[in-house]
Amino acid sequence: MEILDTTLREGEQCYGVFFPIETKKKLACVLDEMGVDFIEVGHPAAAPSIRQAVVEIAALPLNSRLIAHARLDKAEIRMVRELGLAWVGLFSGINTLSLKRYGLTRREVYERISASVLYAKELGLSVRFTCEDASRTDRNELADLYGHLKELGADRLSYADTVGTDTPARIASLQKSLVGVLPFDTLHFHFHNDLGRAFPNAVTAIGLGAQCIDASILGIGERAGLVALEDLLAWSKNGGAGTKKIGCYRIEPLKLAQELVSESINRRHFEQRAFAHKSGLHIHGILQDPVSYEPVDPTLSGHHRAIVLSKLMGRAGLRSVLSRFGIEDNDRNLMRILDQIKSEEFLELAEAQEIGDYLEQFRSGISVPSGYRTHAGT
């Protein structure tokens, strides 16, 4: 069993969580001391502060393999190489929901995936490819994709239960679907916890021989998060069935890691995280079809959906927000505002009044009161 810790990437997509660069470096060192196999350091193209953090983490004398997120985009893939990393994490969905969101045919998406994997390999990068929303993807199409990418030279293949709808029984049936196509013990798994099944799904996958499980400190991540690293370590230390590396992870530094993460959480926001969307890619999907990233309609339980204005926001999400507040959203104005948002490391707004007040500066040219910038740890 291997562990990929994604606290620094997926964790920061959680509403209420921001890590200053120094905290990211400390967390990387602690995770390395714990012996995790991979540390996912972020999505460098998302914001300048993330790029800087990746540069500084890459300069540390760590034993864990560092991996960075990139879309199917040559510039983003090249950026990962230029920042000094050896591993890139590419991702894409191939199911009907994903194709609708991309506005592409399945063949066009396959071609983009293939071209991106080949380009990354040409640059000398090791490639992990994640099929987004794999749990809601036709098993035959999934098997075809994995088999094709293995032939192209992808080093690792990952299965993402993006909205947390999988069950242990479905994970067991997945193993049978991949017989003759891809050994189960070469797969990575990324389980979300929207329905409370991330940990049992992970345990099932490990028992069946999965190669690697994604986890994060305190289980933080987009919406309800994912597998908590501390749960995974405690389980393996207590003789979890199927683990090939029992006793090789150090659990002693865990308390410090938890403290570092806790200090970076805005508790008021964190408590509202289950239906909050912070990643630009997720916001784009939600705007097109909420089912893309919500397994349950939030209104059914008396909650409401929150679109978070932060450095992780993309053009589609911002265009929707600007339209909502009656601000001109032509390309020039959009990029001017987006550049400003991405430059503010700890900006995080989800309430209509806060967002409206913040956006007034782009209507009137006035400075925004400091109270509308939410700093980590407050």
Regions found by a protein language model. Give the residues of each.
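Alpha-helix-loop-beta-strand connector modules within alpha/beta enzyme cores
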Residues: A47-R71, Y110-L125, I171-F189, L232-G240
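Catalytic alpha/beta core domains of metabolic enzymes, predominantly
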Residues: V163-S292
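Active-site beta->alpha loop and helix N-cap motifs at the rims of alpha/beta catalytic domains
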Residues: D32, F38, H43, N63-R128, ...
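Structural preference for beta-strand elements that scaffold enzyme active sites
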Residues: M1-I3, F38-E40, N63-H69, L85-G89, ...
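Conserved, mostly hydrophobic/aromatic
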Residues: G11, L31, V88, F129, ...
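Glycine-rich, proline-tolerant flexible connector loops at the mouths of alpha/beta enzymes
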Residues: V36-P61, S92-L104, E132-D133, Y159-A169, ...
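A mid-to-C-terminal "edge-of-domain" accessory segment
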Residues: M1, T7, A241-T378
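N-terminal capping/small domains of soluble enzymes
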Residues: M1-L72, L309
